[in-house]
Amino acid sequence: MKLAASLNRLSPKRLFRTKSKASVSRSEPSSFSSNASSSSSDGSYGNLKQGPTATPISVLPQNSGDFYTELVQAFKLIDRDDDGVVSRGDLAALISRLSHEPPSQEEVSLMLREVDGGDGGCISLEDLASRVAGTSGEGSVETEELREVFEIFDVDRNGKISAEELHRVFGVIGDERCTLEECMRMIATVDGNGDGFVCFDDFCRMMVPAMNDHHH
């Protein structure tokens, strides 16, 4: 998995926010609330603990606030012990929660080197920001890469993402406030055929503009 490309896409609220003003044709329960997007914005630069090798927030470009706020939030999801760096243990724990099998030591090492660029054995926010900035102009997203992100959500590997699977990912990454009904609403915003699921084609149509937003 291309770690730098995937970290910033793990937030379900980022992925499943609608890009269209078209209304959803099927009716939705009146109990749906609009606070799904607001609860994803409680992270901020100032809340990132400055550990011994943590990154000064000043390294982040000031003209890309929304994107880098989301990058900081993605970093904090993985830095579970809040020491300002993503260690081998942090990364292995995240992958174990999101996948069916725990990663091998070799896989974790490859992911760390991909972002860190050396043998430090950990990833700072600066490493991640530099890596994402360096890959932002590499062109269109590869289908293989999209498939890897899709499979994080498609837990039962049936080729589509359900509201229950989306809700599970929220719990895994530490956002337990999002309800199943809110997940159903998010699914509805991108569900092309109205079957209550997001297939891979729906996912691709949603992801490409979402991942290119910060380029403009």
From Swiss-Prot:
Signal peptide: none annotated. InterPro entries: EF-hand-dom_pair (IPR011992), EF_Hand_1_Ca_BS (IPR018247), EF_hand_dom (IPR002048), EF_hand_pair_protein_CML-like (IPR039647). Pfam families: EF-hand_7 (PF13499). Induction: During darkness conditions. Residues 23-44 have a biased composition (Low complexity). Ca(2+) 1 binds at residues 79, 81, 83, 90. GO terms for molecular function: calcium ion binding. Residues 66-101, 103-138, 141-176, 178-213 form the EF-hand domain. Keywords: Calcium, Metal-binding, Repeat. Potential calcium sensor. This is Probable calcium-binding protein CML35.
